[in-house]
Amino acid sequence: MAVRFVAEVSSNHDRNIQRSKDFIKASSLIGCSGVKFQLFKIDQLFAPEILAKREEIRKRKDWELPLSFIPELSEYAHSLGLQFSCTPFYLDAVKELEPYVDFYKIA
């Protein structure tokens, strides 16, 4: 089994597709095997009563990766020879990601 290095972009994309692609490009340049994002919806990650009480948590909506980015990011990663992954944080995300990801990380 070969060792693989996967760059964790997480939520650092700033909801900006070019910034996301820049992370992918940098991952390729430093020799990573793959790149991983996260797909979550803040209203499914936290209970409604938590969201109602905590403005700083509601602001995390800005950390959501737009689902519309996934096909383009996957294609770009593959064009650079990288595997593409995105951790699903809600059940439907698995179906949404399936056509685009090479692997899932489960923690």
Predicted segments with their positions:
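Active-site beta-loop-alpha junctions enriched in small/polar residues
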Residues: S10-N12, Q38-I42, F89-L91
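Catalytic beta/alpha-barrel core
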Residues: R60-L65, L82-Y90, V94, D102-A107
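Short, well-ordered coil/turn segments that N-cap beta-strands
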Residues: M1-F5, G31-S33, H78-F84, Y100-D102
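Glycine-rich anion/phosphate-binding loops
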Residues: H13-A26, S68
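Conserved, mostly hydrophobic/aromatic
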Residues: E8, S27, L97
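Catalytic domains of carbohydrate-active enzymes, especially glycoside hydrolases
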Residues: D22-F40, Y100
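N-terminal small/glycine-rich loop or linker at the start of catalytic domains
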Residues: M1-N12, F46-A52
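Glycine-rich, proline-tolerant flexible connector loops at the mouths of alpha/beta enzymes
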Residues: S33-L65
